[in-house]
Design a protein with these regions (language model features):
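Structure-specific DNA junction-binding interface
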Residues: 1-84
Length: 84
């Protein structure tokens, strides 16, 4: 599947905002953990962006509010792909 560059950039923008604002703090903790595993800066942010995308998709598909706890569980499971 071809990457939608606009969505890709927007998801990465969300990650950058979360890292700068430290909100939620688990985003920065996850980023630092991924870096410590030898994952590059770019790839660590892409992994986190996958969690952002998964949460947005889940919210739209199920017509439910954003679930920060699910998002954090997915962050904690990285570098494995989001499970929920």
């Amino acid at each position: 599947m071809k990457t939608n560059e606009i969505l890709h950039d927007e998801f990465l923008s969300v990650v950058e905002t979360q890292l700068k604002s430290n909100n939620p703090p688990e985003t920065k903790q996850t980023y630092e953990r991924l870096i410590s595993l030898g994952i590059s800066d770019k790839d660590a942010k892409i992994y986190i962006a996958q969690c952002v995308a998964s949460e947005i998709f889940h919210t739209i598909k199920h017509k439910r509010p954003y679930d920060e706890q699910r998002y954090i569980r997915n962050l904690n499971n990285l570098p494995d792909f989001p499970a929920e």
